[in-house]
Amino acid sequence: MTHTGYAVYLPARVPGMAHGYAQTGSGLTDISDQPQIANPSGGAYSTTGDLLKFAEALAGHTLLTPAMTTTILTPRVSSPQPGGPGVDEYTYGFAYQQINGVTVVGHNGGTPGYEGQLDIYPSTGYVAVVLTNQDNTMIPAIQRTEALLTGS
């Protein structure tokens, strides 16, 4: 994973990093020069390739032992969402849900101008990585991906 790190101050200074955009009254505004240190992501960034490597290492037990992987991915807390599919359960660091009978284990996050989601489909071996560089654009891509991979 050579393209993953933290850009806590100015993401625009990370070589090759996409600029982040936010919707404002005058259209899209490049906000890549805004510090990320106080945001929920902590300035973390990655690429689809690096996140795929992470998921493959986790599933292939090269990141953790099989027992530890099971511990990390076993649901711990139920959290049904009224009125929608939502998150069924949480594991250690991942959301665990059933979509059309297919198990999906994933994690998402974002900060102004950037959003991302990593979903692992254990029963099929599929991994879906969605990264965007514009606020509020990730959900349609995730819904299309889920529909393709779960038949929903």
Question: Would you name each region that the model predicts?
Answer:
Residues 11, 23-25, 29-152:
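Catalytic loop of the DD-peptidase/beta-lactamase superfamily, centered on the K-T-G motif
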Residues 1-20:
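Active-site helix/loop module of the DD-peptidase/beta-lactamase fold
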